[in-house]
Amino acid sequence: MNSTIAEAIKEEGIENYLKNQQHKSLLRFLTCGSVDDGKSTLIGRLLHDSRQVYEDQLKTLHSDSQKIGTTGEKLDFALLVDGLQAEREQGITIDVAYRYFSTPKRKFIIADTPGHEQYTRNMATGASTCDLAIILIDARRGVLEQTRRHSFIASLLGIRQFIVAVNKMDLVNFDEKVFDSIKKEYLEFASGLPKTDIRVVPISALDGENLVVNSELTPWYQGEPLLTMLENAEVGTRDLDLPFRMPVQLVSRPNLDFRGYMGTVAAGVVKPGDVVKVLPSGKESKVKRIVTFDGDLDYALPGEAVTITLEDEIDISRGDLLVAPDAETQVTQHVLANVVWMTEEPLQANRQYDIKLATRKTRGHVDAIRHRIDVNTLEKHDATELKLNEIGLLELSLTNAVGVDPYNTVRDTGSFIIIDRLSNVTIGAGMVVEALAGKTAGKAEFSEFELEFNALVRKHFPHWQALDISKL
């Protein structure tokens, strides 16, 4: 057992310790930046210095640092985070690694994201649930393309708190001029991003300088150490203040006397007696009960998985939305969205894709690519396609009406994934900017031969369960 946890349990008792842990605020943050900027080392050092590393892990770390470490005689703290064999062999991060730690003040979930450009899609996945981003910059190399790319994607995904950690200051002798130059360059770039709270701190992740306490080696730095910034960062409560929204994940029908609608509350608070509207149908009813495994609730908050029963029998199925009558959720078949493209084959207009928005799955196609965004300069360029890791603003038409919110309003009902219809692989991630009126996705066009061949297959080989493409 971790010695810090053991001491706390001994002092408080197990029940009080668990109760105190339960009521601590939780901050989700990610580390991002270019390859070899020290993201995994930073997290490993934070875990170590906050006394969250178990004794057996520490012994393994000493052993692994001698065998495959990249830091000479010093402990390679990145090995605490990089778990894949390929990551350890190459000294890089590939997948998104999640780690948990806590301090007396707050709990934290960290997403350690990869720095290599080909893993940008993994970074976008890690950023999608975070409240804060730590942008790592190597003091020797300054602001690089991936630094800008990750900053832009984090901003695009709604993160409005950045801590810019200028790492490896020990390799530039903790030179204040180097720090000031990097700070100036980054803030000039970030001026083109949406309004963001940005703090800059000089650190040495390997040696632990300015992580938990202020370093004597940077007397010219008057700000807080990194961990204090994390403890004092604002935790998003915006969804709590919004009107209620919940995507229906499943209709629960265990017997003839019960019909409930299961899902996770995306925004707002709901109580028995509240009026809710069903989208896209627009029908209204009152909440009868809020059911959970542990019994009925008096109210449900964002993030809670519940089953809601209604006073009236209404046709509701998976993918529908339950919302408060005053929610500004739009029902549409046409959206404007920012999209991060995640596959080698370029995104092309007019090609049919599967679209999954919250719990609703539908089909659609790209009507137009309004522009592609240069992540280095934030300039907008004309484009006819999006390549791997490129970001663009697109108009999409859907075959079915869906309820959507702008991503900056509600993440869960404003984000979607694009799925390849043949391979079923996720190939893009989208953030809704706004609902557009007037267009719907038309039927897919097939030649006469394709229609006849499809009919022949369905007639003579019904066990293949081929779709009727004339209805697509």
Swiss-Prot record:
Gene3D superfamilies to which the protein is assigned, alphabetical: P-loop containing nucleotide triphosphate hydrolases (3.40.50.300), Translation factors (2.40.30.10)
* Keywords carried by this UniProt record: ATP-binding, GTP-binding, Nucleotide-binding, Nucleotidyltransferase, Transferase
Per its UniProt entry, what is the enzyme's top EC class, as one word?
A: transferase
State any GO BP term from the record.
Answer: sulfate assimilation
- Name its pathway: Sulfur metabolism; hydrogen sulfide biosynthesis; sulfite from sulfate: step 1/3
Annotated residues that bind GTP are located at 33-40, 112-116, 167-170
Segments carrying the region annotation (G5) are 204-206
Q: Which cysteines are joined by disulfide bonds?
A: none
Q: Reaction catalysed by this chain?
A: sulfate + ATP + H(+) = adenosine 5'-phosphosulfate + diphosphate
Region named G3? 112-115
User: Pfam families of this UniProt entry?
Assistant: GTP-eEF1A_C (PF22594), GTP_EFTU (PF00009), GTP_EFTU_D2 (PF03144)
Region G2: which residues?
A: 91-95
**Top-level taxon in the UniProt lineage:** Bacteria
Report quaternary structure and partners.
Answer: Heterodimer composed of CysD, the smaller subunit, and CysN.
Q: Which family does it belong to?
A: Belongs to the TRAFAC class translation factor GTPase superfamily. Classic translation factor GTPase family. CysN/NodQ subfamily.
Report the NCBIfam families cross-referenced here: CysN (TIGR02034), PRK05124.1 (NF003478), small_GTP (TIGR00231)
Function per UniProt: With CysD forms the ATP sulfurylase (ATPS) that catalyzes the adenylation of sulfate producing adenosine 5'-phosphosulfate (APS) and diphosphate, the first enzymatic step in sulfur assimilation pathway. APS synthesis involves the formation of a high-energy phosphoric-sulfuric acid anhydride bond driven by GTP hydrolysis by CysN coupled to ATP hydrolysis by CysD.
Query: Under what name is this protein listed?
Result: Sulfate adenylyltransferase subunit 1
